[in-house]
Amino acid sequence: MINSKPILFSAIQPSGNLTIGNYIGTMRYWSSFQDDYECLYCIADLHSLTTLNKNFSLKKSILDTLALYLACGVNPKKSIIFIQSHVYQHSQLNWILSCFSSFGELSRMTQFKNKRKKEKNDIKNINIGLLNYPVLMSSDILLYQTNLVPVGQDQKQHLELTRNIANRFNFLYGDIFTLPNPLISKNGSKIMSLLDPTKKMSKSDTNKNNVIFLLENISSVFFKIKNAVTDSETPPKIYYDVKRKLGISNLLEILSAITNKEIFILEKEFDGIMYSEFKNIVFDNISKFLHKLQKSYLIYRKDESYLKNIAKEGAIKARLKSEKILKRVFSAVEID
């Protein structure tokens, strides 16, 4: 029987400890997607090579990430879970799609622009992998005839590039690639820094007090929440307003996601309470969430042979699926 479910693709880099922002923005939805979509969940280790150093163990981080996927409810019997580098078709398609991409559009991508700004426009030492990063991402998506990609508002640019590249290829060679669409959540797609809620929470942040990591010691989270930025409104009021109350809004986003309560309900619950009491409630709920997640994670992480077997089986399934589209691409450009 032909599977008529829409195809959904999502990936996370194993380049460091995943954050509560990763969970809220993407991973919390993964288990619920499995019944409605044909899901492919990728561990994007090739993407990680743009930022790694010799003191970082990529192999360990890949297994850590895989165990977290399972702890978040991804079922290998329902979804394809695989490691990007284990499916060589990603790299093959990446080169072909690079020939349908321009330096101009890649240099306008947010990550490259931010790096360029940081280097004060001196681009000679910027990693070429960072420039080509969005093309590899496009390859990841297009390789599986993906219909939907869960993305945050800040990631729509990458998906637009993917569609542009696919359209260029299709214009020349016919309808080879499916054009993917974004799947954007209403709330929580962009969790902000705790101390500077004008910027996104990032696992690469040099100030770790800005970030809540999924695997960190829960006691340290207490101090991070305690010191999280709020505001000076008098008397203190707890409501969602991303223009005037960035810090409070961010904490409400986090709490809403891990309790599955709508923000307007939380606003009513916290009417009239002090910020310190609100923070204590936020911490209590984060603590319960992390304890449950970490307990499940440790069970999976202890069995490396099980994790490696999941990765092996997932790679076999992913290669079978990706080879179909790659053969069509090779035939179109006459390198078959």
Swiss-Prot record:
A motif ('HIGH' region) lies at residues 14-22. It is an enzyme of class 6 (ligase). GO terms for cellular component: cytosol. One of its GO terms (molecular function) is ATP binding. GO terms for biological process: tryptophanyl-tRNA aminoacylation. A motif ('KMSKS' region) lies at residues 200-204. It catalyses: tRNA(Trp) + L-tryptophan + ATP = L-tryptophyl-tRNA(Trp) + AMP + diphosphate + H(+). The keyword Ligase applies. It is found in: Cytoplasm. ATP binds at residues 13-15, 21-22, 152-154, 191, 200-204. L-tryptophan binds at residue 140. Its EC number is 6.1.1.2. Keywords: Aminoacyl-tRNA synthetase, ATP-binding, Cytoplasm, Ligase, Nucleotide-binding, Protein biosynthesis. Pfam families: tRNA-synt_1b. Homodimer. Belongs to the class-I aminoacyl-tRNA synthetase family. Catalyzes the attachment of tryptophan to tRNA(Trp). NCBIfam families: trpS. This is Tryptophan--tRNA ligase. It comes from Buchnera aphidicola subsp. Schizaphis graminum (strain Sg).
